[in-house]
Each structure stands twice: as C-alpha cells, then as structure tokens.
Amino acid sequence: MYQKSLLFSLLATSALAQFPIPDSKGSVTFDAPYEVAAGKTYDGGYKTYGRGVSCSGQGEGGQDDAVFLIQEGGTLKNAIIGSDQIEGVYCLGACTIENVWWEAVCEDALSLKGGSGPYNIIGGGAQGADDKVIQHNSGGQVNIDGFTVYDFGKLYRSCGNCDEQHARTVTIRNVVANSGKTLVGINSNLGDTASIDSSTCATDVKKICVEYKGNNSGDEPEEVSEGPSDACQYSEPLSSC
C-alpha cells in the first residue's frame, strides 16, 4: 500500500511539473519573419511556427531572425512558437500577445522594441529560457496576465543598458512561475516600477523582484537590491504553485 501511495505521489508531482503547452495542430516554417500589420489580428490556430534554424544561444540576434513582427496595435493569438528559431516574437509598437506558447526560448521569447505600449500578454507561456523571456526595450506599460513560465532566467527584464532609456512599468497577475532565477528585473534609478499581484504563484524561483542601476552606456547594469519596495510592489511571500 505504501509503495502504491508513493507511486501516486510521484506521478502527481510529475504532472504538476509538466509544462502545459497545448497540442500542436500542425507546423509552419517561415523563410522570413511574418509581419502582422498595424491593428490587425493573426490567429495561429494553435499551429507551431518556426524558421527552420537552430538556436544560436545567447548571441544577440535581430529583427530578421524573428518568427513574427507585430506592428502598432497588432495582435498575435493562439500560436505555438517552435524551437527552430532564434528571436521569437517582436512587438514594434503596442501589441496584444494572447495564448501564445513558446516550445523552447532561444535568445528571448518576446521583445518589445517600439512604441510606448500598452503591451498586453494574456495567457500562454514559455519554457527553457537561459536568460530573459520578455525583454522590454521601448517605454510604457506591460501587462502580463495568466502567463505560465517554467525553467527560466527572468520572466520580465526592463532593458538595463539600452542606448535610449525609458521609465517602464510592468503589472503581473495570475502568473504561474516554476523553476526560475528571477521573476522581474527593473531599473529603479530610471523610474521603473513593477506590481506583482497576489494571484501570482512561484515555486523554486530564487528572486521575485530585483532592482538594477540601469544605464545607456552598454555596460552590464549593477544589481542594487531585491524584495518589496516602492519600486517592487508586492507582498512576501508569494504562494507556491
């Protein structure tokens, strides 16, 4: 009886740790980034989209390496980004990313590159990010709601050393985070703020909110503090997932 109970316990633990990516409905390989026009919506039908290339690791790619380019006000929804790509999805202006899943993150999953937001990430998820999942280079507000992230470096990072810096704001709700280094990284000296709602849970995440001293010189930004503050707005501890 004990062995049977132990087996059920192990199976339950394994199930909880399983990244809940939807089943793929097919695959599409683009020769070049697919552009979602301003104000338009692309419904991926839960197919897996890639570029037919191997991940180049943490070497900085560029716009030409993305799978999707989303123009101002565009929406990408119901899509799976495959492992055969480098730069994932770029938002070149305010965008909505809804129920988009990353099979495996290469350099970054989602890069916010232009405009002033808002950038809305609703549902979906990503796994296997050595560093960042969401990289925020432009200014404005990011809203992350209902996202699932497993095995990651940082869920969200406000650019720490971009040539042109901005005050950035991120709000996180209903996020499920499992096995990561840092949930959020912001530059408090540049006016960034992060708000993490108690609906977010974190299991085996080493740091919840880290403040950096951002710069525009290209130097590696200095980590100055972690934990709740005027800039990192949340209550400890977050619940386990």
UniProtKB/Swiss-Prot annotation:
Any single GO CC term annotated in Swiss-Prot or TrEMBL for this entry: extracellular region
Annotated keywords: Calcium, Carbohydrate metabolism, Cell wall biogenesis/degradation, Glycoprotein, Lyase, Polysaccharide degradation, Secreted, Signal
Cofactor note: Binds 1 Ca(2+) ion per subunit.
Record InterPro entries: Pectate_lyase_PlyH/PlyE-like, Pectin_lyas_fold, Pectin_lyase_fold/virulence
Subcellular location: Secreted
The protein's required cofactors: Ca(2+)
Signal peptide start and end residues: 1-17
Family named by the database record: Belongs to the polysaccharide lyase 3 family.
PANTHER family: PECTATE LYASE F-RELATED (PTHR33407), PECTATE LYASE H-RELATED (PTHR33407:SF11)
Protein name according to UniProt: Probable pectate lyase D
Organism expressing this protein natively: Neosartorya fischeri (strain ATCC 1020 / DSM 3700 / CBS 544.65 / FGSC A1164 / JCM 1740 / NRRL 181 / WB 181)
